[in-house]
UniProtKB/Swiss-Prot annotation:
Transmembrane segments: none annotated. Belongs to the UPF0102 family. It holds the Pfam family UPF0102. This is UPF0102 protein Rsph17025_0472. GO terms for molecular function: nucleic acid binding.
Amino acid sequence: MSGEVSHRAGFVAEEAVARIYERADRPVTARRWRGAAGEIDLIARDGAEVIFIEVKKSKSHAAAAARLSRRQMERIYGAASEFLAGEPLGQLTASRFDVALVDGMGRIEIIENAFAA
């Protein structure tokens, strides 16, 4: 996949995942939020809880899951920490890290609490 096609496919996958969260009354409050440590694909809220969502797209859900590296998780943690610093409760804010896997057919599997800080 070329860079532009890959970028567009990632954007479409993120929008589809955002719609799932929105339909579940978990409003998406930020898309592609960038801090000094890295980028978070989507940030949603479930009441007072902040949900950091990493979207992975590949041929299969297993292949998508395999694309999430330890190094990438560390960058997500760092960016999430920066984001939480701006919350009223700071690092004490309830939060979780979800991973949304999107396969080649556009099917979405969401893994809540996929990894922990």
